[in-house]
Amino acid sequence: MPKGKKAKGKKVAPAPAVVKKQEAKKVVNPLFEKRPKNFGIGQDIQPKRDLTRFVKWPRYIRLQRQRSILYKRLKVPPAINQFSQALDRQTATQLLKLAHKYRPETKQEKKQRLLARAEQKAAGKGDTPTKRPPVLRAGVNTVTTLVENKKAQLVVIAHDVDPIELVVFLPALCRKMGVPYCIIKSKARLGRLVHRKTCTCVAFTQVNPEDKGALAKLVEAVKTNYNDRYDEIRRHWGGNVLGPKSVARIAKLEKAKAKELATKLG
């Protein structure tokens, strides 16, 4: 058999020599050796993380956290839910500023007053009883009586009374008797006004002539926000807000349903 000739193909030009950049090698000290950490179970000490979620908190903290979550998860009836709508900060500041002028006297002040009166009497100047100055009236029973007798000009209720049943009837009573009422944040702030740790509610009965204009303005703002909106407030339920896990689970189910429906429809 004759030998077949080899087909000569075109030679491809050699690639131009690529000038390689000389990378400067890092000088490694042989005395420093790598010790990579292994954060597996039972291996190296774990790095510092935010472990707030896993802390065993004191009982009172645990309870207040659970209560706040329950108020979000459960359906809260309008009578209780209305206490989540507190007065805005600006109006509340004005209200507290006015209320501060009508704080009841402390035990020391009363002692001083009676002592001065006794000294006057001993000096033979005669004992003339002084007129009682207008002060804030505090406490559920006192305020309820004042509202029923229509003697209260403005009622201020704390939003975080515990148990809430103590004051849950007050907004309805105030509205029925035509007394302006408002809900303000923190029973401690009201307590400070009347020299106590906390206070459920306070009421204005009388004010000095120079403060009547300021009180009238507050009453007008309060009526617009609470008394006039009573029908709207008593329709609004609260809570029923799911947590992130439940939201994620429902979203996953919805996604799966949508996918299944899409495959059925083709």
From Swiss-Prot:
GO molecular function: RNA binding
Major subcellular location class: cytoplasm
One cellular-component annotation, GO: cytosolic large ribosomal subunit
Localization annotation: Cytoplasm
Region (Disordered): 104-135
Ranges annotated as biased composition (Basic and acidic residues): 104-130
Keywords for the protein's UniProt record, in alphabetical order: Cytoplasm, Ribonucleoprotein, Ribosomal protein
A GO BP annotation: maturation of LSU-rRNA
InterPro entries: eL8/uL1-like, Ribosomal_eL30-like_sf, Ribosomal_eL8-like_CS, Ribosomal_eL8/eL30/eS12/Gad45, Ribosomal_eL8/Nhp2, Ribosomal_eL8_euk
Functional summary from the UniProt entry: Component of the large ribosomal subunit. The ribosome is a large ribonucleoprotein complex responsible for the synthesis of proteins in the cell.
PANTHER family: RIBOSOMAL PROTEIN L7AE FAMILY MEMBER
Family in the record: Belongs to the eukaryotic ribosomal protein eL8 family.
Quaternary structure and interacting proteins, as annotated: Component of the large ribosomal subunit.
Protein name: Large ribosomal subunit protein eL8
Taxonomic placement: Eukaryota, Metazoa, Chordata, Craniata, Vertebrata
